[in-house]
């Protein structure tokens, strides 16, 4: 009998970025016409702009989306774990991340060495974050998704997806 192995466990997202959780809503992400599935490879040049992240849920519910790289600066020495790439808050359910408020501007993947994981984590908010209630993190390196969620009382994630990216070879002219 075949057993299902969660790709978030295999990809070490559960454990290194988030704790074990039960997904409670649907979240899809895409760069252009390329859908993101757990563990897929996305070229950095294809991810220069924020992905389209659609979430289910009721219109009255609000969500926070966080994107990090737990492998910065390199998978063998992740001394900047987690590197923060994006935070969007107050996303209404049943819409997409563009309907929320960008707290930390999107920064696309820029892996320098090795294959990096990029993790999109969605949390349900207890209430709307009003101006001034949230302070953006001081720095992008060494961000901690769990600590951010705990501080803002977000609880466990409602959905998570991750993709891989690696440095693209430079065009060589001869």
Curated annotation (Swiss-Prot):
Induction: Induced by abscisic acid (ABA). Pfam families: PBP. May form complexes with phosphorylated ligands by interfering with kinases and their effectors. It comes from Oryza sativa subsp. japonica. This is Protein MOTHER of FT and TFL1 homolog 2. PANTHER family: PHOSPHATIDYLETHANOLAMINE-BINDING PROTEIN, PROTEIN MOTHER OF FT AND TFL1 HOMOLOG 2. Belongs to the phosphatidylethanolamine-binding protein family.
């Amino acid at each position: 009998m075949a057993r299902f192995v969660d790709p978030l466990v295999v990809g070490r997202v559960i454990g290194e970025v988030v704790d074990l959780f039960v997904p409670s809503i649907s979240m899809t992400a895409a760069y252009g016409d390329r859908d993101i599935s757990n563990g897929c490879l996305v070229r950095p040049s294809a991810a220069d702009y924020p992905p389209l992240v659609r979430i289910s849920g009721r219109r009255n519910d609000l969500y926070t989306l966080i994107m990090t790289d737990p492998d910065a600066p390199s998978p063998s020495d992740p001394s900047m774990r987690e590197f923060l790439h994006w935070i969007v808050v107050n996303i209404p359910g049943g819409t997409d991340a563009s309907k929320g408020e960008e707290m930390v501007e999107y920064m696309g993947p820029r892996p320098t060495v090795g294959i990096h994981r990029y993790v999109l984590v969605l949390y349900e908010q207890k209430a709307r974050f009003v101006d001034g209630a949230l302070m953006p993190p001081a720095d992008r390196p060494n961000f901690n998704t769990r600590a951010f969620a705990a501080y803002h009382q977000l609880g466990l994630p409602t959905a998570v997806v991750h993709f891989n990216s690696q440095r693209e070879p430079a065009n060589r002219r001869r």
